[in-house]
């Protein structure tokens, strides 16, 4: 904001919301009866990840860590889809949990997802940080360009014209595959 003013956030946040809704729609249509899929829109990490933290604080007594999973879908607008294994600028948080294991397995063993890579995200964190720190299995998906950056993030060109529908569709398919493997 300080350098460029407000941006449209088509890539950052818009693609994540679209992917989350498309993923949930698919899962709701064909879901085991003992499973529940909910979509939580936290207000984005730009708000200090307070939405995710507040939701967790309000619901932590209802969460069974053995059967509660969080999939965060951030900027999936262009470039190559990645699953995040580490985050943090000053301190590192390792995401070592069941969802990351599933993402790693899918990217290595399922030919549809061989292009999906792991990522150590060194600039700040994602909404998943609160869940991971609480011992809840959490996975973040994001897309990165050839320089390891999230395309158009917080820039004036963060517009619908810079969204690659193929990248968004890949994120939807990968998210569904992660969830279905978890449910199997």
Regions of interest found by a model, annotated:
Residues 2-95, 102, 113, 124-127:
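Acidic/histidine-rich catalytic neighborhood of metal-dependent amide-processing enzymes
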Residues 76-184:
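Active-site-adjacent substrate-binding region
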């Amino acid at each position: 904001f300080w350098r460029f003013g407000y941006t449209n956030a088509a890539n950052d946040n818009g693609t994540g919301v679209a992917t989350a809704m498309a993923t949930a729609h698919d899962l709701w249509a064909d879901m085991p009866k003992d499973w529940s899929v909910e979509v939580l829109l936290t207000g984005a990490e730009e708000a200090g990840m307070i939405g995710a933290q507040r939701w967790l604080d309000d619901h932590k007594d209802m969460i069974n860590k053995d059967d509660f999973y969080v999939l965060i879908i951030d900027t999936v607008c262009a470039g190559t889809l990645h699953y995040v294994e580490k985050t943090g600028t000053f301190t590192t948080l390792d995401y070592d949990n069941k969802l990351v294991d599933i993402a790693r397995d899918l990217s290595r063993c399922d030919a549809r997802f061989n292009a999906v890579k792991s990522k150590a995200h060194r600039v700040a964190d994602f909404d998943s940080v609160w869940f991971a720190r609480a011992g809840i299995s959490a996975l973040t998906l994001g897309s990165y360009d050839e320089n390891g950056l999230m395309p158009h993030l917080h820039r004036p060109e963060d517009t619908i014209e810079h969204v690659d529908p193929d990248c968004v569709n890949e994120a939807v398919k990968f998210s569904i595959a992660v969830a279905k493997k978890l449910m199997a």
